[in-house]
């Protein structure tokens, strides 16, 4: 029987098969952070249970941490309690922890791949919705709830239904200044935020093959915004090169054995998908979200849509509501929208390639006096590499604040927030109402588009000099 990549990984991890396409799957890697794990550990103690596979469980502090200080008190009392609890839990149950004093500490979906924990063909779970990021390596990865966190800690397994298969093939020639973020936002805009519900999406095509691993992670990270359970990209030479000699990657003869297995992790020819889409991205422009959902997105040179242009009454109402919240008028140009803050970071776009691309735009430029801009590396390793390359100096000279690793302004769960009515050009993944702070208005963009917004409004990065002179 011909199988898709998803079916191969799913079938290889079945511990017990039940009725109605539901199975108990073995979990190869369990990632933890300070927000969704405390209750799970409390339940373990109440029931006198232990962690079955501590060596397959790794934790970090990222959601609540201060990006201005390594002091555990810096993010407030609740954050301090959660971080102290994570330290206690990891010590008691013998789990490796990347705490504030660990030079490798960072966002869970950044440090997993860079440490070689994320491996092709593995199953990976975390109490965080953007766990799909790891699918860029050909790993079946998805977010889970706190009760499931407890179940995996105790059994190293999880009951999962078999999801449907979707293939998204991306073809065409990628033009200069068009990034992986633009491509995935464009696709979400075309298909919608519920298009992936009930599916695992496999991304493929020449465009994907030419992407580096950081770009692939951006694609898979944002697939969850289509409603998908997970996303996958088949591993290839680019994957192997990225993983070679990482701390936890297989070594010596085990590396050779791993490569042989990883090369089997491709969808069989003529395997059946439940849905298939092909997108030619040759002519797309830089993308900017205008509303309060990732699918409310336009090319930079377009206007905010007229409500009456939506034939669907629900979409019309959503557009009206979004414009009210975002304080935008139909017919106004995206390029005329004034920005209060710029945020470069998050598990979507805080890796070294993201910072390099943004720094290229910012070199010898200064931010407007009317805006505040911060750049938050995704991990200590990313921060150190950026500083070795002098990227921090470029950001600082441009007027950015160079911060410590963490989730930062992606979510209003730490000190980095928008105030009521503030508008942000953000490289994060969600633009929901209040996502970056109560009353905050979020526009999702690529790192280079965020960098180009330093003049206090959106700019077509392709025409940066001509539009800002």
From Swiss-Prot:
Entry EC no(s): 4.2.1.33
Cofactor(s) required for function per UniProt: [4Fe-4S] cluster
Pathway(s) where this gene product acts: Amino-acid biosynthesis; L-leucine biosynthesis; L-leucine from 3-methyl-2-oxobutanoate: step 2/4
Gene3D superfamilies hit by this protein: Aconitase, domain 3
Transmembrane regions: none
Class of the enzyme per the UniProt entry, highest EC level: lyase
Reaction(s) catalysed by this chain's protein: (2R,3S)-3-isopropylmalate = (2S)-2-isopropylmalate
Regions annotated as coiled coil: none
Cofactor binding note of this UniProt entry: Binds 1 [4Fe-4S] cluster per subunit.
Any GO BP annotation: L-leucine biosynthetic process
GO terms for MF: 3-isopropylmalate dehydratase activity; 4 iron, 4 sulfur cluster binding; metal ion binding
Residues where [4Fe-4S] cluster binds: 347, 407, 410
Keywords linked to the UniProt accession: 4Fe-4S, Amino-acid biosynthesis, Branched-chain amino acid biosynthesis, Iron, Iron-sulfur, Leucine biosynthesis, Lyase, Metal-binding, Plasmid
Matches recorded under InterPro entries: 3-IsopropMal_deHydase_lsu, Acnase/IPM_dHydase_lsu_aba_1/3, Acoase/IPM_deHydtase_lsu_aba, Aconitase_4Fe-4S_BS, Aconitase_4Fe-4S_dom, IPM_dehydratase_rel_enz, IPMI_cat
Entry-linked CDD domains: IPMI (cd01583)
Protein family per UniProt: Belongs to the aconitase/IPM isomerase family. LeuC type 1 subfamily.
Role description: Catalyzes the isomerization between 2-isopropylmalate and 3-isopropylmalate, via the formation of 2-isopropylmaleate.
PANTHER family, sorted: 3-ISOPROPYLMALATE DEHYDRATASE, HOMOACONITASE, MITOCHONDRIAL-RELATED
Subunit structure: Heterodimer of LeuC and LeuD.
Protein's name in the database: 3-isopropylmalate dehydratase large subunit
Organism: Buchnera aphidicola subsp. Schizaphis graminum (strain Sg)
Gene behind the chain: leuC
């Amino acid at each position: 029987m011909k199988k898709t990549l998803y079916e191969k990984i799913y079938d290889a991890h079945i511990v017990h098969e039940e009725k109605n396409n539901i199975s108990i799957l073995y979990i190869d890697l369990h990632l933890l952070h300070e927000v969704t794990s405390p209750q799970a550990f409390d339940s373990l103690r109440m029931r006198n249970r232990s962690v079955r596979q501590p060596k397959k469980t790794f934790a970090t502090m990222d959601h609540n941490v201060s990006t201005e200080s390594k002091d555990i008190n810096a993010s407030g009392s609740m954050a301090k309690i959660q971080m102290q609890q994570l330290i206690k839990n990891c010590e008691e149950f013998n789990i490796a922890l990347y705490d504030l004093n660990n030079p490798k500490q960072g966002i869970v979906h950044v440090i997993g791949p860079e440490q070689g924990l994320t491996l092709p063909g593995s199953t990976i779970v975390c109490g965080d919705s953007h766990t799909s990021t790891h699918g860029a390596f050909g790993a079946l990865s998805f977010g889970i709830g706190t009760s499931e966190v407890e179940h995996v800690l105790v059994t190293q397994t999880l009951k999962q239904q078999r999801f449907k298969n979707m293939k998204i093939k991306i073809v065409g020639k990628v033009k200069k200044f068009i990034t992986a973020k633009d491509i995935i936002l464009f696709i979400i805009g075309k298909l919608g935020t519920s298009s992936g519900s009930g599916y695992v999406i496999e991304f493929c095509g020449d465009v994907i093959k030419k992407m580096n691993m950081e770009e692939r992670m951006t694609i898979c990270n944002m697939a969850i915004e289509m409603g998908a359970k997970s996303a996958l990209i088949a591993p290839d030479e680019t994957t192997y090169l990225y993983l070679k000699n990482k701390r936890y990657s297989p070594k010596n003869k085990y590396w050779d054995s791993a490569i042989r297995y990883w090369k089997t992790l491709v969808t069989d020819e003529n395997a059946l998908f439940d849905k298939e889409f092909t997108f030619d991205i040759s002519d797309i422009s830089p993308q900017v979200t205008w509303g309060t959902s990732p699918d409310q997105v336009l090319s930079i040179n377009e206007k905010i849509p007229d409500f009456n242009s939506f034939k669907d009454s629900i979409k019309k109402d959503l557009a009206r509501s979004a414009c009210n919240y975002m304080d935008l008028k139909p017919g106004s140009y995206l390029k005329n929208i004034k920005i209060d803050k710029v945020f470069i970071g998050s598990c979507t776009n805080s890796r070294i390639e993201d910072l390099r691309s943004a720094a290229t735009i910012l070199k010898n430029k200064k931010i407007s006096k009317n805006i505040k801009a911060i750049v938050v590396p995704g991990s200590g390793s990313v921060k150190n590499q950026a500083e070795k390359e002098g990227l921090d100096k470029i950001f600082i000279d441009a007027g950015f604040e160079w911060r410590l690793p963490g989730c930062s302004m992606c979510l209003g769960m730490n000190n980095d927030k928008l105030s009521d009515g503030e508008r942000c050009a953000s490289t994060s993944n969600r633009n929901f109402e209040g996502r970056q702070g109560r009353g905050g208005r979020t526009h999702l963009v690529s790192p280079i588009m965020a960098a180009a917004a330093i003049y206090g409004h959106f700019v077509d990065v392709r025409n940066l000099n001509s539009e800002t002179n």
